[in-house]
Amino acid sequence: MGLSLTVKEPVGISCLEKSDKHCHFISRAREGDSFYIRREAISCPLARFYLGIENPNVKSLAKTLVGWDDSHDEDTAVRYLKSAPRLENCPGYIVYFPYPHENLKPDVIIRIGSPGDIMGLIQRFSCLTGARVEASLSGIGAACGECTAYPLATGKENVSLGCYGSRPGMGLNQGELLLAFPSGSRMVEVCALE
């Protein structure tokens, strides 16, 4: 799937006028839909944090993580949130689409595959570049943090196992992993060789 964050309202593509979780929007793109949303349509507070949609009260979000059983206590949740690469300010619109798409250019690309598929892509990437993919994962905020904010904030590739929200939210099957990378990554070249 491809995602693009843009200041200008997209033309030639429909606006989805509903609020939902970022991972659910990605799932729609996985199913073949191309659309955009206004950034305010992201309903998940953790996705809003990662994508820079609002400047949240970290203590309040820490309480949410504890309530979701994603943190042992609030202090640990605050440490987790402060350690996370995130976007500072999300532009007004997010575009979701199947990738590749002839008319839409992504800022970040998310691939879903088996461990063998993802391993093959990473091996070819390392063979081509001499670089390793250094994954940053936590099992918390996977689609929003690990697969969208991380590649955009760091300019690096990332592997994710998903999380308790994104695995069902994106319809991930048992054994499927996520590989995310910015559009400027040489991983684009690797994927084109498939």
What are these regions (language model features)?
Residues M1-E194:
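Acidic, serine/proline-rich low-complexity intrinsically disordered regions
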